[in-house]
Amino acid sequence: MKAVIQRVKEAKVSVEGRVVGEIGQGVLVLLGVEIGDACPQADWMAEKIVNLRIFADSEGKMNLALPEVKGEMLAVSQFTLAGNCSKGRRPSFDTAAAPEEANRLYSYFMGQVWERGVPVQSGIFQADMEVSLVNDGPVTFILETPPKR
C-alpha cells in the first residue's frame, strides 16, 4: 500500500462538476492499493498517517498530529501509485490490486481513520475526479507499508 500525504489548508474532490468531498485544515491522502495488501497494511497506514506529527506547534516546529490540530482527511483512491515506469514509456499496473479488493481496503482504511477520531471525506472509487487543494508549506510525504510477511 502506498500513500502520498499532503498537508493542506483546504482540499476538495469533484466528480462531474459536483463536490463529493471537502475538508478544511488537514491532509489530502492519495491511496494506492497493491496486490497482497490486506487489513494489516491498511491498519498500519491509518495509524501512521493519523499520528504523523506534520503540523506546527506554537514554536513553529513540526510536532503535532491530526487529532491535536482537529484536522481532517480527504482520502482519494489512486491506483496509479502502483504504476511501474521503469521499462519503456507506458506505465505498467501489474502490481495494482483488483478493483473489488482495492475498494474494500480503501473503505476499510477510511473506517480505521474514523475509529482513530479523525473525520474523513472521500472521492468516489474508480470515478474520474478533479482534486483541488491549497498546500500548506508545501509539506508532502510518500509512505509505503513495510514489506508483507
Swiss-Prot record:
Catalytic activity line of the entry: glycyl-tRNA(Ala) + H2O = tRNA(Ala) + glycine + H(+); a D-aminoacyl-tRNA + H2O = a tRNA + a D-alpha-amino acid + H(+)
Top class in the EC scheme: hydrolase
Subcellular location: Cytoplasm
Main location: cytoplasm
Annotated keywords: Cytoplasm, Hydrolase, RNA-binding, tRNA-binding
Residues spanned by motif Gly-cisPro motif, important for rejection of L-amino acids: 137-138
One Gene Ontology term of the molecular function aspect: D-tyrosyl-tRNA(Tyr) deacylase activity
Assigned GO CC terms: cytoplasm
Classification via CDD domains: Dtyr_deacylase (cd00563)
InterPro entries linked: Daa-tRNA_deacyls_DTD, DTD-like_sf
Gene Ontology biological process: D-amino acid catabolic process
The protein's role, per its UniProt record: An aminoacyl-tRNA editing enzyme that deacylates mischarged D-aminoacyl-tRNAs. Also deacylates mischarged glycyl-tRNA(Ala), protecting cells against glycine mischarging by AlaRS. Acts via tRNA-based rather than protein-based catalysis; rejects L-amino acids rather than detecting D-amino acids in the active site. By recycling D-aminoacyl-tRNA to D-amino acids and free tRNA molecules, this enzyme counteracts the toxicity associated with the formation of D-aminoacyl-tRNA entities in vivo and helps enforce protein L-homochirality.
Similarity-based family: Belongs to the DTD family.
Complex formation: Homodimer.
Protein name: D-aminoacyl-tRNA deacylase
Gene: dtd
